[in-house]
Amino acid sequence: MKLYYKVGACSLAPHIILSEAGLPYELEAVDLKAKKTADGGDYFAVNPRGAVPALEVKPGTVITQNAAILQYIGDHSDVAAFKPAYGSIERARLQEALGFCSDLHAAFSGLFAPNLSEEARAGVIANINRRLGQLEAMLSDKNAYWLGDDFTQPDAYASVIIGWGVGQKLDLSAYPKALKLRERVLARPNVQKAFKEEGLN
């Protein structure tokens, strides 16, 4: 598998899951402004929407959208928690959490819009806080991770997004469970491996 990524972007989530799954993978960086791959290729030829991530599973076959990519990687791994049985409540909960991560991701996206006025930024942050409050309510102090005691794909995705808030110096003190989740995720050796591969601390 080849993952097309941008350093620190949402593509870090599937990078983490590839690392955790122990599957062989290649990485190719993308210049999202120029829409060029690291080897100078036209990224629109890989993903017509021009966004990361994109996962090439074999020559000519590419999956886009994080939720789909994360589930695909899980289903092709040997990690039981990454691929609950079809039709099970556990699988539905995993997909529910991935869907919420997409909502949380969308809330944060506005933070990176160019020329954002103070009023617009305040509105974006209010929406982020609303979504983070929802996430906080979903998390349990009794569990090590979001869906229980096993690390799963939503943990990776949510942690990447929460990290954007940390990087933007947002006040996240109202979300201790979310911050603790991120802390646990960042402590995992395979997560640290993915960060190192992207040149992140």
Curated annotation (Swiss-Prot):
Gene assigned in the entry: gst
Keyword match Ribonucleoprotein: no
Every GST C-terminal domain range: 87-201
Gene3D superfamilies listed in its UniProt record: 1.20.1050.10, Glutaredoxin
Lineage: superkingdom: Bacteria
Keywords of this entry: Cytoplasm, Transferase
Transmembrane segments: none
InterPro entries named among the record's database cross-references: Glutathione-S-Trfase_C-like, Glutathione-S-Trfase_C_sf, Glutathione_S-Trfase, Glutathione_S-Trfase_N, GST_C, Thioredoxin-like_sf
Catalytic activity: RX + glutathione = an S-substituted glutathione + a halide anion + H(+)
Entry EC number(s): 2.5.1.18
Keyword presence, Transferase: yes
Function: Conjugation of reduced glutathione to a wide number of exogenous and endogenous hydrophobic electrophiles.
Family under the similarity heading: Belongs to the GST superfamily. Beta family.
Major localization class: cytoplasm
Name of protein: Glutathione S-transferase
Subcellular location: Cytoplasm
Subunit structure: Homodimer.
Chain sites annotated for binding glutathione: C10, K35, V52, Q65, N66, S102, D103, L104, H105
